[in-house]
């Protein structure tokens, strides 16, 4: 008789709060570092490992995909494969993406790297890409691997590049 234990979100939040690092880095660790895995995936797929601006959109899509898949895997009793669980995971990934964009946009404006308008419009593009990735992550397997690369490569050409600069 194996006892099924429900995950305790309060224990997880307490663990995140008490560990070193930013809230974002702590959450990333708990989710299996989806951005780090996405960056590795993208570097291997584009430009022979060199980082370029054209990789921003696929990085956002793939990071959101992996975040959604990780959240699906965290749901108890196999709920991550239910319609409700897939939707909750995609919603959660978009909330986390929006929090990241708010932080990144604020930081960029504060440091003088971009105007409020540029930061806002770039965030909108990134959130569009995050949404697409969360949809990809909500369907099919939840392996956090490169099995969905072909799907992402097909949709990426219809998405914004994720970089915005006002014309001077």
List the predicted regions and their residue ranges.
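Bulky hydrophobic segments
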Residues: 6-121, 128-131, 135-168
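Short, Lys/Arg-enriched N-terminal segments with co-localized hydrophobic residues
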Residues: 1-5
């Amino acid at each position: 008789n194996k006892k099924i234990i429900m995950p305790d979100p309060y224990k997880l939040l307490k663990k995140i709060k008490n560990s070193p690092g930013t809230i974002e880095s702590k959450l990333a660790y708990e989710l299996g570092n989806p951005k780090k895995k996405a960056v590795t995936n993208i570097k291997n797929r584009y430009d022979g490992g060199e980082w370029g601006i054209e990789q921003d959109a696929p990085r956002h899509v793939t990071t959101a995909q992996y975040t959604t898949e990780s959240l699906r895997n965290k749901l108890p009793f196999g709920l991550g494969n239910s319609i409700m669980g897939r939707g909750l995971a995609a919603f959660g990934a978009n909330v986390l993406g929006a929090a990241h964009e708010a932080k990144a946009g604020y930081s960029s404006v504060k440091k003088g790297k971009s105007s409020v308008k540029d930061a806002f419009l770039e965030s909108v593009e990134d959130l569009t890409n995050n949404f697409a990735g969360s949809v990809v992550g909500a369907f099919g397997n939840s392996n956090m691997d490169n099995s969905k690369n072909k799907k992402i490569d097909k949709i990426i050409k219809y998405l914004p590049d994720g970089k915005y600069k006002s014309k001077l």
